């Protein structure tokens, strides 16, 4: 055994450094905070984005864009998720019941992602071209 091979026992914890407990600790007096200044004081920190009184970047740049209200109540449904619905008919209500869609969702679109192994009838949902073909290939149909 040599000094360079020593290591702590597995599972052991290292005691954390106690700040401000004398010179010998290596973190005495100023406790790693340097001398004076705002950041050395207790509670002394600047809020995120503050640039010393200069107009912050976030306020210098213009606002743009908006969040469409329709996007908040719209969701995409993967093809594989249609199999989670109990029964043959898949519509907005049955998808909500199967916990595929949120309760406040008003519009949904079936997209081609994953595989569909059972025949289902999709009713009242938008369906992409690829998903429409996949539903038909699985023996199901789409009613608009």
UniProtKB/Swiss-Prot annotation:
Keywords: Ribonucleoprotein, Ribosomal protein, RNA-binding, rRNA-binding. Residues 1-58 are annotated as: Disordered. Belongs to the universal ribosomal protein uL15 family. Binds to the 23S rRNA. It comes from the Bacteria. Part of the 50S ribosomal subunit. GO terms for biological process: translation. Pfam families: Ribosomal_L27A. Transmembrane segments: none annotated. Residues 21-31 have a biased composition (Gly residues). GO terms for molecular function: rRNA binding; structural constituent of ribosome. InterPro entries: Ribosomal_uL15, Ribosomal_uL15/eL18, Ribosomal_uL15/eL18_sf, Ribosomal_uL15_bac-type, Ribosomal_uL15_CS. One of its GO terms (cellular component) is cytosolic large ribosomal subunit. The keyword rRNA-binding applies. This is Large ribosomal subunit protein uL15. NCBIfam families: rplO_bact.
